């Protein structure tokens, strides 16, 4: 292992005190290439919902750090936004907050015959994510989970 810290982890460490000071929650940091362009995306949230001013303030403050630290040698765009209505669930707090909501769980390999499961979030323990599906509780092993997102189900 090279000991090199991923950009997402470095940016998370810089962003965490900023979002906490503003009474926000850091949901995720992504470093992605789309259509030949690089994007550094920071997703924030709060109980009452994110406002444009929240995104602008986090963007302004993290941009100062990025300019000073200069972690990327090439050009990229910084985006700060809410995680959206299909937000990912990352922390234990997320699993508690969204208990009873419909979620989409994607797995690395088929679990109980499928790589995608929709159901009502029943909880999370040390080994599994629990959902209710067709009046039955299912335990999806954490080692198999690729992502868990809220499912708005229009």
From Swiss-Prot:
It is found in: Cytoplasm. GO terms for biological process: ribosomal small subunit assembly; translation. One of its GO terms (cellular component) is cytosol. Signal peptide: none annotated. Keywords: Cytoplasm, Ribosome biogenesis. The keyword Cytoplasm applies. The keyword Transcription does not apply. InterPro entries: Ribosome_maturation_RimP, RimP_C, RimP_C_sf, RimP_N, RimP_N_sf. Required for maturation of 30S ribosomal subunits. PANTHER family: RIBOSOME MATURATION FACTOR RIMP. Belongs to the RimP family. This is Ribosome maturation factor RimP. The lineage of its organism: Bacteria, Bacillati, Bacillota, Clostridia, Eubacteriales. The gene is rimP.
